[in-house]
Amino acid sequence: MNIPMKNIIFPTLILSLLTFTALCRSDSLLVAVSSNFHTPMKLISEEFEKRTNYKIILSSGSTKKQFTQIVNGAPFNFFIAADTETIERLEKLKLPVRNSSFQYARGQLVVFSPREDIDVKQLLMASRDQKIAIANPSLSPYGKASKELLKNLKIWNSQKNNIVSGINIEQAYQFIKTGNVEIGIIAKSQLMRIKNQSEHSYWIPPQNLYSPINQSAVLLTDNEPSMLLQEFFHTNFVLNLIQEFGYGLPNDE
């Protein structure tokens, strides 16, 4: 799937505006956050701002694209990724604050259809031609896990030509939500945001069918607001919120 030029230019302009805003405010914290965690992070930011004198400015996108932006000098203060491997790659480049990374959540996959009262697993396993939306396995940790799930279900080879890849897990969900695709793989955190879940159909596959989606964060600047945000992630408020949005905690088996 070709990505229109506007999809490349527009996020770059947004990042430039966010960066300019953050640089103009000494009390601002520019945070790169994976698209799957954007909604809970907005709530975390609101509470953090109430408890401190610092303003959080969020930039949401795929983890791989944000990695590229950081390597190319984007002045983020804090990076909340959708995996652990990307953080480790940054650490090898000695870009983050030393020994500042931590795992904050464990993601889960859900096979989802907007249709009501259907066997989603059976629909996924069906041999007939059907479009299946997933996040891009090359860009998104959730996409990588989705591909692994389909492989372990022994249907990747038969269905790979029917895959519709979103840039990230949020776009994959939008493909399903708008009716362009009948079924897809989304994050459990997205399912938790859907009102009237009983009007839709979903299947939560066993986590032994794909590698754990361990999600980590890291400080990119050694300053007070970054350290305060790191500490805030370990509070009961944030830990409870993470679970409410369908994530597991780092010590969950």
PLM features: what roles do these ranges have?
Residues 55-64:
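A short beta-strand-loop structural module common to alpha/beta enzyme folds
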Residues 11-20:
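Bacterial N-terminal signal peptides
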Residues 26-51, 64, 68-74, 81-84, ...:
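Exported/periplasmic ABC-transporter solute-binding proteins
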Residues 96-100:
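Short, P/G- and charge-enriched loop/turn segments at secondary-structure junctions
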Residues 20-26:
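Sec/Tat signal peptide C-region and signal peptidase I cleavage site
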Residues 59, 101-102:
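Short beta-strand
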Residues 2-12:
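Bacterial N-terminal signal peptides that target proteins for export
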